């Protein structure tokens, strides 16, 4: 191991492997390097804790950043652009801090956290123009719990903005998620369900499909502005039982403002202005749904309930 090393003000390009590799070394600082046109990752790290990676320019590699089995890592103020695969792929690493980075023009997922990257805090990043029309999420969580996505700009990515799969107790707060090529935010299940995730105080607008699509259980969707999406504003799929939709402002989404296909959903205190919407609130094949204290204006219909029981 090489603990407490500093790698600063270098240029590494056109290698047959990675630009910089840190392995089994703690308390390393990687600062203000240019890592470009390398065959694998620009920056690669494994089994190293308390590493700071800041102010680097990482571009035109096969992929940008890889972190595995490394806890308490800070990725700060890096420019990660123009990669054929991932922008940043992080796995099995706890308490990550990912702050004020720019991630653009990755063909694969721009920022992918997987396999127990719990307790991450991701804030004030710009994630733009990534993916293609079939794949490549701007932000992707898989098997990640108790992490926070806060005040990021997720804009004009060709696929979905934020996708959370088999992940629980995460918070998506105060982000701008706009003009993405599929969903704004999507919560999915896999072999286990996603549960107890919170989507709060975000602006989700002008996405090509649904603004927020939820398959997770016990999801809270609170105080978001969801507007001008080309399909539904919010859709809760049949797996998304016990979702709460509270205090949101839904404006002119082109499908239904809110579509519910799950049981035990609460829809309350939302403002729905649906001049471009089909139905303000549609409930299909769902039982024990509560709809209360909402303000609805416009749309072809106010509330539509079909094949459903036990309403309040």
Place the predicted regions along the sequence by residue.
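Surface-exposed loop/turn motifs in large extracellular/passenger domains
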Residues: 1-8, 22-31, 47-54, 68-76, ...
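A cross-taxa feature marking solvent-exposed loop/turn segments within ectodomains of secreted
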Residues: 5, 15, 28, 38, ...
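Short glycine/acidic-rich loop motifs that flank beta-strands on beta-rich extracellular proteins
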Residues: 16-24, 39-46, 62-69, 84-91, ...
């Amino acid at each position: 191991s090489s603990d407490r090393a500093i790698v600063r003000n270098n240029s590494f390009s056109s290698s047959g492997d990675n630009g910089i590799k840190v392995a089994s070394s703690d308390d390393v600082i990687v600062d203000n390097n240019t890592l470009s046109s390398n065959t694998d990752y620009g920056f690669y790290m494994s089994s190293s804790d308390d590493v700071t990676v800041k102010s680097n320019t990482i571009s035109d590699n096969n992929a940008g950043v890889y972190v595995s089995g490394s806890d308490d890592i800070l990725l700060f103020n890096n420019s990660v652009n123009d990669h054929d695969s991932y922008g940043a792929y992080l796995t099995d690493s706890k308490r990550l801090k990912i702050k004020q980075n720019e991630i653009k023009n990755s063909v694969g997922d721009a920022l992918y956290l997987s396999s127990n990257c719990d307790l991450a805090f991701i804030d004030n990043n710009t994630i733009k123009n990534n993916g293609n029309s079939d794949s490549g999420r701007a932000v992707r969580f898989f098997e990640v719990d108790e992490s926070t996505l806060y005040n990021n700009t997720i804009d004009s990515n060709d696929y979905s903005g934020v996708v959370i799969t088999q992940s629980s107790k995460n918070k998506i707060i105060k982000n701008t998620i706009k003009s993405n090529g599929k969903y704004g935010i999507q919560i999915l299940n896999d072999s286990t369900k996603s549960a107890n995730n919170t989507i709060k105080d975000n602006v989700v607008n002008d996405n090509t499909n649904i603004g927020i699509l939820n398959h997770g259980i016990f999801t809270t969707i609170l105080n978001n502005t969801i507007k001008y999406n080309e399909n539904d504003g919010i859709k809760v799929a049949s797996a998304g039982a016990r979702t709460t939709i509270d205090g949101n402002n839904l404006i002119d989404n082109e499908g239904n403002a809110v579509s519910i296909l799950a049981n035990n959903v609460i829809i309350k205190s939302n403002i729905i202005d649906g001049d471009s919407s089909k139905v303000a609130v549609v409930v299909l094949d769902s039982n024990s749904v509560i709809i209360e204290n909402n303000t609805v204006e416009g749309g072809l219909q106010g509330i539509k309930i079909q094949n459903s029981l036990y309403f309040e």
